[in-house]
Structures are given as structure tokens and as C-alpha cells.
Amino acid sequence: MSEKIDFSHVRFLIVDNNRLMGKLVKDILAMLGAVQISLARDYDSALGSLRSGHIDVCITEWNLKPRSGLELLDFIRNDATSADRLLPVIMLTANSEMEYVVESRDAGVTEFLAKPFTADGLYRRLVSVIARPRDFVSVRGYFGPDRRRQQLPFDGADRRAKE
């Protein structure tokens, strides 16, 4: 854990159906110095916190029941009643196959963390979303953090349509 961040003023929302997993994430956040931690057990109970605008980071499980973490992410990024469309969202899941990573990325997730995870793994995702936030992109069919992690030189014709 190289970079030091003061988490005492960061407001977290953890959304997970599994009480033990929610408590584990909460305990890790507390160990890192977080004190403002809210827990929600499902999509519907998370909406109140998300609509209030008093959340700085959302950590959600992909496999929420009856509505998924992706549906929650869609609410955050695209619903008119979402208080913060730029809210950093860390997606937790045991589904670490590339298709899940790509689907999360394409839905606008800020970071992805596969289970089982370590405290250091969560810490690194938190540093990424808090200390090194990415620019957001709004194009037809996508609103979310810039999916490019690095700028690579391009050697070719510019084929993008002029806006």
C-alpha cells in the first residue's frame, strides 16, 4: 500500500446481498480509516442513498438479487434521478471471466475487483478511483469513465466522424 489516502471523509456505499461479504468489505474500509460506511442489501435499498447524493464511492456486487449490480450501475450512470452520474463504482464479483470484465467496463464501471480479493487489492482500486480519477466520456450508447487506460500512438487515418 504505497499511496496514503485519508479515507475518514470519504462516504462509502457497499451494496451486497451477502451479509458476510458486506461486513468483510466494511471491516476492510474501517481498517483503512473509513468511518462513513453505509450498507445496502439490494438494488432498491441502495437507491435512497444514491439519490441523496451523499455518497463518494459505491462498491457493489455484480450478482445482486433480484436486480443486478449492472442494473444499479445503469441507474447511476443513466437515470435522471441519479444524484451523481460521475460516482466512482467498484464492481465486485466472483465472475472474473473476461466477458464479465468487458460487460462491466462497457456499462461504465470505474474499477473491477474479482473475488476472492485482498485488502491491498481493494485499497489499490480505491486509490485509483479517488487519487487518479479518469475523465468521463459521453458518446452515443455510452456514458462513463474513459475506457482507455493509456495513450498509445496511433499511426493511421482518422476515421472518426466530425462532431
Feature-to-residue mapping (PLM):
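CheY-like receiver
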Residues: 131-163
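C-terminal output helix
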Residues: 117-130, 134, 138
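Active-site residues of response regulator receiver
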Residues: 61-63, 93
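Two-component/phosphorelay signaling modules centered on CheY-like receiver
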Residues: 19-43
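Alpha4 helix (beta4-alpha4-beta5 surface) of REC/receiver domains from two-component response regulators
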Residues: 26, 71, 96-111, 137, ...
